[in-house]
Amino acid sequence: MGKAVKETRYCKVLRQAKIRDNDVAYGIEKIFVKDLNQEEIRFVYFKDTIRMEEQLVARPLDLPEDDLIRLMELSIKQNVFSKEFVGKLKDILDK
């Protein structure tokens, strides 16, 4: 496990791909959940608030398909997903 992008009590953010759109940002992260001792993929939504820029919002991420494609492409380029995952995804799409 490499150096964390960010660390909280809950997890370490190992890798992150994020797209900014005015006062919000959305992304995909590879995280290490401390209590479960496992890596997971997390879809995230951030909003600028008075307290801080890009505060994590605890809600589902809703995106138009075009934005999801952009985010998936960026996540693949920034190695958020493992090569094994990308290969399996490619196999599904090739069927």
Where are these regions (language model features)?
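Weak global preference for isoleucine
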Residues: V13, I19, I28-I31, I41, ...
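Short non-domain terminal segments
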Residues: T8, K30, I41-V44, N79, ...
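Short linear sequence motifs
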Residues: K3, I19, L36-E39, L74, ...
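Negatively charged, low-complexity tracts enriched in Asp/Glu with abundant Ser/Thr
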Residues: M1-A25
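Secondary-structure boundary/capping motif
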Residues: K12-L14, Q38-E40, D62
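A short, structured beta-strand/loop element
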Residues: V24-R59
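Mixed-charge, Lys/Arg-enriched low-complexity segments
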Residues: T49-K95
